[in-house]
């Protein structure tokens, strides 16, 4: 119930303001471990680094999602990208890129199923979901799918020795298909960065107008 209330509050705030996203923080625990990478993650998060940057990414993500699905759902998915990466080494845009690459061409549909059996917006394989504590049916729930996807990307990050770009490619797999996946992901990242730049420019204009008044 608490998680649902936090998510509802986040969606409301995103809908009310596209250039300002003040969201209640909700911790998503990083998988247990005591590697150097784990310790570095904890040090970074304890300093509260990147919270403002995280917030700045949300409007751009919502706009990009809204090109593929209805605005209300776009806001909800953008909220999940923010909330489910708190307390992890990932940024909202990392999960947004994966969602767009996996199901952006299918309306970011929660019931998407690949020919290999991957499910949900983030296309997690059921066998992998089970290792993170989720069932195949859970993956058709956007919130649970996002949680499973974050944990799956984290496992790939460990495999990639902390190389996030490589981890994202491993999220798809290996070989030519993974190469094509990586090319698409970079295109979606470019789209998101362009939207972030546009919002930043709009913010600068508003600030200049406010100073002139």
Where are these regions (language model features)?
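Sec-dependent N-terminal signal peptides
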Residues: 4-13
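Catalytic glycan-binding domains that act on GlcNAc-containing polysaccharides
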Residues: 18, 22, 28-31, 38-213
């Amino acid at each position: 119930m608490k998680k649902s209330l936090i998510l509802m509050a986040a969606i409301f705030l995103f809908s009310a303001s596209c250039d300002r996203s003040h969201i209640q923080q909700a911790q998503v625990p990083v998988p247990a471990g005591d590697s150097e990478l784990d310790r570095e993650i904890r040090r970074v998060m304890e300093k509260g680094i990147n919270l403002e940057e995280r917030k700045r990414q949300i409007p751009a993500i919502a706009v990009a999602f809204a090109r593929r699905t209805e605005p209300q759902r776009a806001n909800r998915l953008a909220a999940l990208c923010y909330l489910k990466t708190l307390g992890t080494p990932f940024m909202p845009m990392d999960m947004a890129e994966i969602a767009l690459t996996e199901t952006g061409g299918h309306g970011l549909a929660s019931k998407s199923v690949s020919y290999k059996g991957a499910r949900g917006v983030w296309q997690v394989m059921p066998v992998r979901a089970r290792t993170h504590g989720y069932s195949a049916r859970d993956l058709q729930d956007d919130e649970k799918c996002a949680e499973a996807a974050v944990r799956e990307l984290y496992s790939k990050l460990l495999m990639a020795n902390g190389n996030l770009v490589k981890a994202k490619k491993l999220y798809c797999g290996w070989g030519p298909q993974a190469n094509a996946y990586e090319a698409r992901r970079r295109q979606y990242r470019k789209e998101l960065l362009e939207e972030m730049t546009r919002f930043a420019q709009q913010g600068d204009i508003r600030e200049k107008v406010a100073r002139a008044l």
